[in-house]
A protein has these predicted regions:
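Active-site acidic/histidine proton-transfer and metal-coordination neighborhood
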Residues: 1-63, 73
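Histidine-acidic metal/acid-base catalytic patches
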Residues: 27, 44-66, 70-151
Length: 151
C-alpha cells in the first residue's frame, strides 16, 4: 500500500474501534516508532502523522502514546510538540537518547520537560521504557532521583 491508502485504512479501522471503545470507556493509544534506528519500515514514525490519524478518527478515545526516545530521534522539538498536542496525548514514555538507556544518560533534560508538561496541565502517566545499563535497583533509584529534580 502507498502511504495515502495505508493512512485511509488505519483511520477506517481505528474509527470502527473507537466507536466501540467510546461505549465501553476504553481509550486506544497509538505509538509512533523511530525508523532511523530501531524500526525500519514501520508506517507510523512521525508525531505529526500520528496526530493527523487521531484528528481524522475524531474520537476522544483515541490518543497518542508519545515516546520521547523515538520522537527525539525522528523529529526533535520535544517540548514544543508536547505542549501543542497535550490534549491528544494519553501516555508518555521516557528513555535516554541516544541509546535507550537510563534517562539521566541523555541529551534531553527530562526533569525540565516533565515539569513543563505538568505545569501545562498534563495529568497522564509517564512510563519508564529503557534498557538499564546499571543493575535494576541502582538504575531505578538513580532514575527516580534524577527525574524528581524538577519538582
Amino acid at each position: 500500500l502507498d502511504r495515502d491508502h495505508a493512512m485511509d485504512a488505519m483511520v477506517g479501522t481505528l474509527s470502527e474501534c473507537a466507536s466501540k471503545c467510546e461505549k465501553r470507556g476504553i481509550t486506544l493509544i497509538l505509538e509512533a516508532f523511530n525508523t532511523k534506528v530501531d524500526h525500519p519500515g514501520y508506517f507510523l514514525d512521525d508525531p505529526e502523522t500520528t496526530i493527523e490519524v487521531i484528528d481524522r478518527v475524531g474520537s476522544s478515545k483515541v490518543k497518542m502514546l508519545y515516546d520521547i526516545y523515538h520522537m527525539q530521534i525522528m523529529a526533535g522539538d520535544i517540548l514544543t510538540f508536547l505542549l501543542q498536542h497535550k490534549d491528544s496525548i494519553g501516555h508518555i514514555h521516557i528513555a535516554g537518547v541516544p541509546g535507550r538507556a537510563e534517562p539521566f544518560n541523555s541529551e534531553l533534560n527530562y526533569p525540565y520537560i516533565i515539569q513543563e508538561f505538568i505545569n501545562a496541565g498534563y495529568s497522564g502517566a509517564f512510563g519508564l521504557e529503557y534498557f538499564p545499563e546499571l543493575p535494576d535497583q541502582e538504575s531505578l533509584t538513580k532514575t527516580l532521583l534524577y527525574l524528581s529534580q524538577g519538582k
